[in-house]
Amino acid sequence: MAGMKEIRGKIKSVQNTRKITKAMEMVAASKMRRAQERMRAARPYADKVRAIAAHMSRANPEYRHPFMVANDGAQTAGIILVTTDKGLCGGLNTNVLRATVQKFKELEEKGQKVEATAIGGKGLGFLNRFGAKVMSQVVHLGDTPHLDKLIGAVKTQLDLYSEGKLSAVYIAYTRFVNTMKQEAVIEQLLPLSSDHFEADDGTPATSWDYIYEPDAQAVVDELLVRYVEALVYQAVAENMASEQSARMVAMKAASDNAKTVISELQLVYNKSRQAAITKELSEIVGGAAAV
């Protein structure tokens, strides 16, 4: 009977755990919908700003902002690492951290040092354990990204690039593909890249420049600030949508596994109970026969 009591305790414990994971699954599903709405609302703007910046990188404008000039003499690169503040989201953070480590190695093989900005507590903890130099950080963002909280930490890297102290600035985050799939990506933020310089049909587009009014410097200075803000905000929005999707899937898997464990324990309990009853009946029958 002691074994049966222990099994009942295990069943109760797993049932309580399943209630928690089921509740977390439902909360994550609700947050996921809101995060996806924010991400999808911001994505067209970010894509258009990225395309404009790509055109500018291929053109020969009358004014060239520091963000458009490659700092070939700099021996240090910057990486903005976007992760979550919380765990329980499957391999989401692991994948982007693995990609970041690979980027660190690639840059170091080229003789470049790396300085990082951490957005999210998980990334900050990893960078500290990894021994990377963290120049700025943002944690506890909550469920809604706010640009005013983000841009201060990112501006540290932008200022260093403008001063010619960084050779490039990259941003690492998890891009949302769909509810079941998210992918870790690392994009070059600075100098302006022409990677997205394509026509609508995917073929290389023709290079051309814009007409700037009232003057090129005023427009370009403002535009490139918006470019950085848009890409950083979009990266965080994509990462948050990916986080809630991954957490919902992970908690659903945990709930399903808990249900399986409960069924298996219930079967073991029933077998133990049946064996105990059979033993008692055998003892009663044996006693009656002896009398």
From Swiss-Prot:
Keyword entries, A-Z: ATP synthesis, Cell inner membrane, Cell membrane, CF(1), Hydrogen ion transport, Ion transport, Membrane, Transport
Source superkingdom: Bacteria
Pfam assignment, any one: ATP-synt
PROSITE patterns referenced in this protein's UniProt entry, alphabetically: ATPASE_GAMMA
Signal sequence annotation: none
InterPro entries: ATP_synth_F1_ATPase_gsu (IPR035968), ATP_synth_F1_gsu (IPR000131), ATP_synth_F1_gsu_CS (IPR023632)
Xref: SUPFAM superfamilies: ATP synthase (F1-ATPase), gamma subunit (SSF52943)
Gene Ontology BP annotations: proton motive force-driven plasma membrane ATP synthesis
Membrane topology note: Peripheral membrane protein
GO MF term set: ATP binding; proton-transporting ATP synthase activity, rotational mechanism
GO annotation, cellular component aspect: plasma membrane; proton-transporting ATP synthase complex
Compartment list: Cell inner membrane
Family per record: Belongs to the ATPase gamma chain family.
Chain's role: Produces ATP from ADP in the presence of a proton gradient across the membrane. The gamma chain is believed to be important in regulating ATPase activity and the flow of protons through the CF(0) complex.
Subunit-level organization: F-type ATPases have 2 components, CF(1) - the catalytic core - and CF(0) - the membrane proton channel. CF(1) has five subunits: alpha(3), beta(3), gamma(1), delta(1), epsilon(1). CF(0) has three main subunits: a, b and c.
Protein's UniProt name: ATP synthase gamma chain
Native source organism of the sequence: Burkholderia cenocepacia (strain ATCC BAA-245 / DSM 16553 / LMG 16656 / NCTC 13227 / J2315 / CF5610)
